[in-house]
């Protein structure tokens, strides 16, 4: 009797097990699991690995009840300023948070899920999607069967950052993301603290202004500011800021070395601009020294020595700038003397 009971029990367990294998998770179960994962993820971006790609994409028959937009990331490339992966990742999370906020109470909120795949432990997924370069974003629609044929963002779609990503999502999914909700630069608490500081310091500032005891009344501050503005203008700082140029890059032939100067006229590293700006500033300061200090020296010999020293340093600085320009552009600068001098 005991043997028969054990056999019946084992048979029952086997039937349940086979039934489970024959009936994988339904679409609603997968969608609910994605919603659960999204609720615990930062900005609603779900971290995927190789198993998740198989579970939620390749193992699910089409049409799926949801779309997935995936950002491909590589932590070891975050230091590459030209790729700007951390910035694009933040913008992608911003689009995700905006979409969830604006579609939280609607059925559309469960039709699209934002995900990210990191290359360290998911190289197989990169190969499945045929990811050859970063940044890369793929949209897996409900009818996508071949992952290599998923909708991908073009290079131009990244120019507008979060706004361009939102346009791509709306164009491909017909869902509404709405305007991007960027976090304020200053929180309400910080604004309150700043206002309190201004209110407290206003009487003190007014008193100092009336007495002429502020930094704006100190001629040395204006002198330093003028030198800074001059250096800022001649060193190409705005070029570096606008184009986000790095100070230096690693040598392609030897990764242990750094490159500060590039022999290319269309590209300039930050170190190049600062070097040229420093030389220009030296010449400008020497000119100010000669016209404001040397002329007041009473001894003629000291005047001449100071003038010769200033001219020598200025000549050296200008020569370095000309040499760098010749090296980058490949064009030589030749002096042309008046015909009467050639005698």
Swiss-Prot record:
The chain crosses the membrane at residues 186-206, 221-241, 274-294, 305-325. It comes from the Eukaryota. Glycans are attached at residues 105, 108, 146. It holds the Pfam family OST3_OST6. Residues 1-22 form the signal peptide. Residues 23-185, 242-273, 326-343 are lumenal. Keywords: Endoplasmic reticulum, Glycoprotein, Membrane, Signal, Transmembrane, Transmembrane helix. It is found in: Endoplasmic reticulum membrane. Residues 207-220, 295-304 are cytoplasmic. GO terms for cellular component: endoplasmic reticulum membrane. Belongs to the OST3/OST6 family. Subunit of the oligosaccharyl transferase (OST) complex that catalyzes the initial transfer of a defined glycan (Glc(3)Man(9)GlcNAc(2) in eukaryotes) from the lipid carrier dolichol-pyrophosphate to an asparagine residue within an Asn-X-Ser/Thr consensus motif in nascent polypeptide chains, the first step in protein N-glycosylation. N-glycosylation occurs cotranslationally and the complex associates with the Sec61 complex at the channel-forming translocon complex that mediates protein translocation across the endoplasmic reticulum (ER). All subunits are required for a maximal enzyme activity. This is Probable dolichyl-diphosphooligosaccharide--protein glycosyltransferase subunit 3A. It comes from Arabidopsis thaliana.
């Amino acid at each position: 009797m005991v043997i028969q009971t054990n056999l019946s029990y084992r048979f029952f367990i086997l039937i349940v097990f086979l039934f489970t294998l024959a009936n994988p998770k339904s679409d609603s179960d997968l969608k609910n699991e994605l919603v659960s994962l999204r609720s615990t993820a930062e900005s609603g971006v779900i971290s995927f690995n190789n198993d998740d790609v198989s579970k939620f994409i390749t193992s699910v028959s089409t049409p799926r009840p949801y779309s997935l937009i995936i950002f491909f990331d590589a932590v070891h490339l975050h230091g590459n300023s030209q790729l700007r992966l951390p910035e694009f990742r933040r913008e992608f999370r911003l689009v995700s948070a905006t979409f969830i906020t604006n579609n939280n109470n609607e059925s559309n909120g469960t039709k699209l899920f934002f995900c990210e795949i990191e290359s360290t432990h998911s190289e197989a997924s990169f190969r499945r999607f045929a990811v050859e370069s970063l940044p890369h974003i793929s949209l897996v629609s409900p009818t996508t069967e071949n992952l290599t044929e998923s909708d991908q963002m073009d290079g131009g779609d990244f120019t507008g950052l979060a706004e361009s990503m939102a346009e791509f999502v709306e164009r491909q999914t017909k869902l509404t993301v709405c305007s991007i909700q960027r976090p304020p630069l200053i929180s309400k608490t910080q604004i309150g603290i700043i206002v309190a500081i201004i209110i407290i310091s206003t009487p003190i500032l007014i008193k100092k202004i009336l007495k002429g005891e502020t930094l704006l009344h100190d001629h040395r501050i204006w002198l330093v500011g003028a030198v800074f503005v001059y250096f800022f203008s001649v060193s190409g700082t705005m070029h570096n800021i606008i184009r986000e140029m790095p100070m230096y890059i690693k040598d392609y032939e030897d990764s242990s070395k750094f490159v500060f100067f590039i022999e290319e006229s269309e590209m300039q590293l930050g170190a190049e601009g600062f070097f040229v700006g420093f030389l220009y500033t030296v010449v400008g300061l020497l000119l100010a020294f000669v016209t404001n200090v040397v002329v007041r020296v009473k001894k003629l010999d000291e005047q001449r020595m100071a003038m010769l020293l200033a001219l020598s340093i200025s000549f050296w600085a200008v020569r370095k700038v000309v040499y760098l320009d010749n090296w980058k552009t490949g064009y030589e600068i030749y002096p042309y003397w008046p015909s009467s001098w050639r005698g």
